[in-house]
Regions:
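N-terminal beta1-alpha1 cap of cysteine-dependent amidohydrolase-like domains
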Residues: 1-89
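Secondary-structure boundary/capping signal
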Residues: 38-41, 111, 133
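Cysteine-nucleophile active-site neighborhood
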Residues: 63-131
Length: 133
């Protein structure tokens, strides 16, 4: 396994103003939690047609969005294509909310609108041995 040199936080929208005003931008949440001396962080604005790097020395974190994976925006289809390319070269990636959905959609999963609306919450997770590496 190659050494990862940096993390790319992929923003999929400016965020909801109500959330930004109370909690700040979601792209800043993760960078504030990660020690930048150990892992340099680049922020990529996919919704502005910036695309992440295809390199074995990078890890992607794809964030949430007010948009839906099935919306017809060019940046969404471009990001899906990049995700497939990244999977081919084994770029590790984490999807949060929209990010999770776009990874699955790129892989062919059907993503549909929830009849109950948005679901928001948190869950405890644990790292596998490979995740600890």
């Amino acid at each position: 396994m190659s050494t990862k040199e940096r993390i790319e936080i992929i923003s999929c929208g400016p965020g909801l103003s109500e959330v930004n005003s109370q909690c700040g931008r979601s792209s800043d949440w993760l960078s504030n939690l990660i020690n930048n001396d150990s892992f340099p962080i680049d922020k990529i604005n996919a919704y502005k047609s910036e695309m992440p790097t295809l390199s074995e020395q990078v890890v992607w974190i794809i964030l949430g969005s007010k948009h839906s994976v099935y919306d017809s925006y060019k940046w969404i289809s471009n990001l899906k294509s990049k995700i497939l390319d990244a999977i081919q070269i084994n770029i590790p990636m984490l999807g949060i909310c929209f990010g999770h959905q776009i990874i699955l959609s790129a892989l062919g999963a059907k993503v549909v609108k929830n009849k109950k609306g948005w679901e928001i919450g948190s869950s405890k997770i644990s790292l596998t041995d490979k995740g600890v590496e």
